[in-house]
Each structure stands twice: as structure tokens, then as C-alpha cells.
């Protein structure tokens, strides 16, 4: 499994409640560009419309070797391929106040298909973010002290 892009801010800004694996509909030059790692997930989010899941605001840079007439919108909405029950479950979460669905990472699976890891998340407050940072620093300090004693 080769990771093409990760949304590093997602785990910092959100508390991930549940994750899903979704296929994504891309054009040929988008696939080539994505496999080169030209993907940005930072501001992306998922919406459910008419029983279909769509990924908004994900930036895929135009493929370098594609001619000018074939270049499309780099931030267009892209359809996610999920089972109907998964879409309904995500829709149930999205109707609750304070919950959202965001992409966590994009990767190539063992069969060569590009997949997107979707997380249903709740936004963290500034206090929660500080607490997480503090816990991480304490854990790092304990590991550092443990290494010195050996």
C-alpha cells in the first residue's frame, strides 16, 4: 500500500470517530498526477447528495505531460464509491450537529486501485488541541528518559 497523500491536520483539528475506505472516480491524467503525489487533501470534505457521496475541494495538480486543451478544474467535486449502507451511515452522522466527514489519506491498494480513507469526525476545541499536544510531549519525554536509563 503506497500512500499518495495524507491530511495531517485532520487528526490535529478533529477527533476521528469512524473511518471508511472509498474508491474514487478520477480521469486518466488525474490518476497519473495523483500517483506522482500531486494531491492536496487539507481543505477537502465529503458531502452526501442524492444518495451519492462526493469529495469536495481536493486539489489534484494538472498532469505535467497533458496538453493545454485537456486540463480540467483541479478542485472539481469527485464521486466516492461506497456501498449504499455506508453512504446512509455517513449521512446519519452528517445530520448530527458538530460532525463532518473528511478525507484522511489517499493511497494505492494492493490491486492497484486508488482509495481514499474517509473519517467521520468531530471538531476539537483549542483546549483539546493543547491537551493533546501536552500529552504527546509528556509521552515523548518519558520515552527519552527511558532510553537514557538503558
Swiss-Prot record:
Keywords assigned by UniProt, alphabetized: Cytoplasm, RNA-binding
This protein's record includes keyword RNA-binding: yes
Pfam family membership, one: SmpB
Cross-referenced CDD domains: SmpB (cd09294)
Gene Ontology biological process terms from the UniProt entry: trans-translation
InterPro entries given in the database record: SmpB (IPR023620), SsrA-bd_prot (IPR000037), SsrA-bd_prot_CS (IPR020081)
Record GO terms (molecular function): RNA binding
SUPFAM superfamilies for the chain: Small protein B (SmpB) (SSF74982)
Predominant location category: cytoplasm
Record carries keyword Cytoplasm: yes
GO cellular component, as recorded: cytosol
Subcellular location(s) of the protein: Cytoplasm
Family membership noted in the UniProt record: Belongs to the SmpB family.
PANTHER family: SSRA-BINDING PROTEIN, TMRNA-BINDING COMPONENT OF TRANS-TRANSLATION TAGGING COMPLEX
HAMAP family the UniProt entry points to: SmpB
Known role: Required for rescue of stalled ribosomes mediated by trans-translation. Binds to transfer-messenger RNA (tmRNA), required for stable association of tmRNA with ribosomes. tmRNA and SmpB together mimic tRNA shape, replacing the anticodon stem-loop with SmpB. tmRNA is encoded by the ssrA gene; the 2 termini fold to resemble tRNA(Ala) and it encodes a 'tag peptide', a short internal open reading frame. During trans-translation Ala-aminoacylated tmRNA acts like a tRNA, entering the A-site of stalled ribosomes, displacing the stalled mRNA.
Protein name according to UniProt: SsrA-binding protein
Organism encoding this protein: Coprothermobacter proteolyticus (strain ATCC 35245 / DSM 5265 / OCM 4 / BT)
The encoding gene: smpB
Amino acid at each position: 500500500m503506497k500512500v499518495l497523500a495524507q491530511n495531517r491536520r485532520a487528526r490535529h483539528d478533529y477527533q476521528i470517530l469512524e473511518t471508511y475506505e472509498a474508491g474514487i472516480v478520477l480521469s486518466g491524467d488525474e490518476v497519473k498526477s495523483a500517483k506522482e503525489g500531486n494531491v492536496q487533501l487539507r481543505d477537502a470534505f465529503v458531502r452526501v447528495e442524492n444518495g451519492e457521496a462526493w469529495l469536495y475541494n481536493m486539489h489534484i495538480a494538472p498532469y505535467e505531460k497533458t496538453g493545454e486543451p485537456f486540463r480540467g478544474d483541479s478542485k472539481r467535486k469527485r464521486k466516492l464509491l461506497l456501498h449504499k449502507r455506508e453512504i446512509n451511515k455517513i449521512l446519519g452522522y452528517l445530520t448530527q450537529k458538530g460532525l463532518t466527514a473528511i478525507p484522511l489519506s489517499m493511497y494505492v491498494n494492493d490491486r492497484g486501485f486508488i482509495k481514499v480513507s474517509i473519517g467521520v469526525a468531530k471538531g476539537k476545541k483549542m483546549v483539546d488541541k493543547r491537551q493533546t499536544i501536552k500529552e504527546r510531549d509528556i509521552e515523548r519525554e518519558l520515552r527519552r528518559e527511558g532510553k537514557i536509563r538503558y
